[in-house]
Amino acid sequence: MARVTVEDCIDKVDNRFELVLLAGHRARQISQGAQITVPRDNDKNPVIALREIADETLSPDDLKEDLIHSLQKHVEVDEPEADGEVIADQTGAAVAATETDDAEDNITFDRMTEEDLLAGIEGLVPPEKSDDY
């Protein structure tokens, strides 16, 4: 069988660097025991991975999603909070979760003009000089 080259796969995956990442990921999957979708023909795992991409037996988008999923260390899951859960408000006092909705409406923010900010910055004392800098 002819060698699989990047040109055989580049029309399936536009970026050759992404192609290398996807083929490497698929080769690792094959070495871990994943089912191959093309005949082995005494080829090594990276060549099989490239042949699978070239023959479109695997979707590059599916490989990309699988690669991203395999590299994630923490998957954030949105879980609803239980009603009546006790949490702390800004003052540190324990408040039931149902009461915090009303407390959020009463929050006020101080507004500062640019002139007030600059005047406050000018009043700051610069740090002592040291040899660390």
UniProtKB/Swiss-Prot annotation:
The reaction(s) this protein catalyses: RNA(n) + a ribonucleoside 5'-triphosphate = RNA(n+1) + diphosphate
Subunit structure of this chain's protein: The RNAP catalytic core consists of 2 alpha, 1 beta, 1 beta' and 1 omega subunit. When a sigma factor is associated with the core the holoenzyme is formed, which can initiate transcription.
Family of this protein: Belongs to the RNA polymerase subunit omega family.
Source species: Mesorhizobium japonicum (strain LMG 29417 / CECT 9101 / MAFF 303099) (Mesorhizobium loti (strain MAFF 303099))
One matching Pfam family: RNA_pol_Rpb6
Reported function: Promotes RNA polymerase assembly. Latches the N- and C-terminal regions of the beta' subunit thereby facilitating its interaction with the beta and alpha subunits.
Enzyme Commission number, as recorded: 2.7.7.6
Keyword vocabulary terms for this entry: DNA-directed RNA polymerase, Nucleotidyltransferase, Transcription, Transferase
GO biological process: DNA-templated transcription
The protein's name: DNA-directed RNA polymerase subunit omega
Enzyme class: transferase
GO cellular component: DNA-directed RNA polymerase complex
InterPro entries linked to this entry: DNA-dir_RNA_pol_omega (IPR003716), Pol_omega/Rpo6/RPB6 (IPR006110), RPB6/omega-like_sf (IPR036161)
GO molecular function, one term: DNA binding
